[in-house]
Regions:
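Acidic, surface-exposed loops and disordered segments
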Residues: 1-199
Length: 199
């Protein structure tokens, strides 16, 4: 039951040397892909680290925290807003297939047009970045339109960065719950040198 998982899952600071099955970790990452994400865009990537030298470098980048220095494996959750156009096209293709399979024939064309407008035009515009200027343009444009009808107005570049991070956090939480169900403990880490982690 979910309550059992929630009661079991804790941020563990010191790991035993009990071997961890890498296939189980990969399976839990597949479950994490099922987490909800904004517009199903999944603008994140999971990097499963098992190499000893890379683990040591990550532990150093994590400021020597015990949960990092004793971990046999790590997963780095990376936001990937740069994939927005590619992911929008992929989701639009899935939507089109779903509409053709499940929608009444007389409603298909309108639903396909709505999907093309949303995933083909709106989302690429909303997720695009350009030194803060595109966010300012979006904020101004959407703010003006919202005077006349309800409209999403939290669309600055900072707002969209938050959206991507929230979706990634949902995937990370789903992963931690899946690991708990598999009988493993986890610890989310934030205190780190992100420049070193990126290397």
């Amino acid at each position: 039951m979910l309550i059992d998982l929630l009661n079991h899952r804790r941020a563990v600071r010191h790991y035993s040397d009990q071997p961890i099955d890498a296939d189980t970790v990969r399976g839990c990452l597949e479950q994490a892909r099922l987490a909800p994400s904004s517009s199903n865009m999944q603008l994140y990537q999971f990097i499963h680290v098992t190499d000893a030298a890379t683990l040591q470098a990550l532990a150093t980048a994590c400021l020597g925290q015990q949960s990092a220095t004793t971990a046999q494996q790590m997963v780095v959750f990376v936001t990937r807003q740069d994939l927005s156009r590619k992911r929008a096209r992929a989701v639009m293709a899935l939507e089109a297939d779903n509409i053709r399979r499940t929608s009444p024939p007389e409603k298909q064309e309108k639903r396909l047009a709505n999907s093309r407008a949303y995933y083909g035009k709106l989302l690429p515009f909303v997720y695009a970045r350009g030194f803060g200027l595109l966010g300012l343009v979006r904020k101004t444009l959407f703010g003006a339109v919202s005077l006349f009808r309800p409209l999403y107005t939290d669309c600055s570049e900072a707002d969209m960065r938050v959206v991507v991070h929230k979706s990634c956090a949902l995937a990370a939480q789903t992963f931690m719950l899946a690991m708990s169900e598999a009988g493993y403990d986890t610890c989310p880490l934030e205190g780190l040198d992100s420049r070193r982690v990126k290397r």
